[in-house]
């Protein structure tokens, strides 16, 4: 089974397709091991044996138009039926066990803030739905039995879904059309499975030693009447909680960069818009002393407080122990990496994992401070999930 990725950088009218046909993608236990390496990487929130850092070494690469037509063949009976299932699944997410589980976790996480264990911590959740783009009847008829494949679950996951290449490409192109200002990627490796994302957050990008990262924290629903843009959006009021959250992330990233550079500039914070949400954003550009240490830089930056917490290591351990649903590759990062060429790595937000039966697991989270309110935080995760739900 090949590993492949479609990805489209913000504002571009073309996308890139990369694939590795020969051999297996490189499996790494830590992002530090990316030092001196090139390829296309997908990294989890916390590397482990089950969810390693995976580095593709593409032997095929080509540009494709990101403005293709929608695949109309899915608009049949099964599409209508799964649209009804989608509405049912989303309705279930706002009541019953999903909400109750989130409320329990919120109380657990929130208590740690009052006890002074963390100054900020991020709580995430997951929603599972049946996708109208990959209906079960289509997926099941495309299954290929391969007795030579190992029985390991991670290596066989998504093999049937990936057979439906036309639907997957159409799903990617639709996401590109809906979100021209976001980084859009559809990535499959035997180790990670199949992921689709439309994310606004740069982890690290640049060429040679000129690098850029960002602090993206603070969220509220956007007004439809406002101009959709990445440049500063005027007239948006922010609560003290959101401004404090943004400053935590900015301070953390600035401290990380000082280890690798003594030449950096900040711009912000300012209001930006991503899909249906406003965010507070600060851009940080810096000159990297040693381009062979991209893995070290990534290890210092990620996961940022925007998706983890402060202090980072303690917050990540707490999240791994107390979130009921493992994040897997949500809130990790993805994109092409090069020591001498161009690097474009984005945080894996507004994403979903497409499973072997055609169902999808959507992820979203929000940063908690002492003054956070459970109902507001729940609604924030609902709004963030809407980015990918709108594609479906």
Label each PLM-derived region with a short phrase:
Residues 103, 111-117, 177-179, 188-192, ...:
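Secondary-structure boundary elements
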Residues 3-20, 132-137, 145, 162-244, ...:
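An anion-binding catalytic pocket shared by soluble metabolic enzymes
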Residues 40-42, 120-122, 186, 212, ...:
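A structural signal for short, well-ordered beta-strand segments and their strand-loop junctions
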Residues 119-124, 185-189, 295, 312, ...:
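Short coil/turn segments at secondary-structure boundaries
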């Amino acid at each position: 089974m090949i590993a492949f990725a479609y990805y489209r950088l913000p504002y571009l009218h073309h996308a890139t397709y990369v694939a590795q046909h020969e051999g297996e993608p490189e499996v790494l236990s830590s992002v530090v091991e990316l030092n001196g390496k090139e390829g296309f990487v997908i990294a989890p929130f916390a590397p482990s044996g089950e969810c390693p850092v995976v580095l593709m070494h593409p032997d095929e690469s080509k540009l494709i138009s990101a403005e293709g037509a929608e695949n109309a063949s899915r608009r049949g009976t099964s599409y209508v039926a799964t649209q009804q299932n989608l509405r049912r699944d989303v309705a279930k997410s706002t009541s019953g066990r999903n909400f109750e589980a989130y409320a329990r976790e919120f109380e657990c996480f929130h208590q740690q803030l009052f006890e002074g264990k963390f100054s900020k911590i991020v709580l995430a959740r997951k929603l599972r739905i049946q996708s109208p783009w990959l209906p079960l009847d289509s997926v099941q008829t495309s299954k290929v039995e391969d007795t030579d494949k190992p029985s390991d679950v991670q290596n066989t996951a998504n093999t049937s879904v990936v057979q439906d290449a036309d639907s997957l490409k159409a799903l990617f192109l639709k996401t590109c059309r809906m979100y021209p200002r976001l980084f859009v990627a559809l990535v499959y490796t035997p180790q990670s499975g199949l992921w689709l994302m439309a994310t606004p957050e740069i982890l690290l990008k640049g060429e040679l030693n000129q690098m850029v990262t960002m602090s993206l924290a603070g969220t509220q629903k956007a007004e439809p009447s406002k101009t959709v843009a990445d440049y500063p959006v005027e007239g948006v009021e922010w609560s003290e909680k959101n401004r404090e959250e943004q400053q935590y992330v900015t301070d953390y990233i600035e401290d990380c960069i000082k280890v690798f550079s003594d030449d950096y500039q900040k711009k912000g914070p300012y209001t930006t818009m991503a899909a249906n949400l406003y965010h507070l954003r600060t851009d940080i550009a810096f000159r990297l002393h040693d381009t062979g240490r991209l893995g070290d830089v990534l290890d210092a930056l990620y996961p940022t407080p925007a998706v983890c917490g402060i202090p980072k290591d303690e917050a990540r351990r707490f999240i791994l122990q107390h979130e009921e649903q493992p994040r897997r590759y949500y809130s990790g990062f993805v994109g092409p990496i090069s020591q001498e060429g161009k690097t474009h790595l984005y945080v894996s937000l507004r994403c979903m994992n497409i499973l072997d039966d055609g169902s999808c697991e959507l992820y979203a989270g929000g940063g908690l401070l002492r003054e956070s309110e459970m109902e507001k935080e729940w609604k924030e995760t609902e709004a963030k999930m809407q980015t990918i739900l709108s594609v479906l």
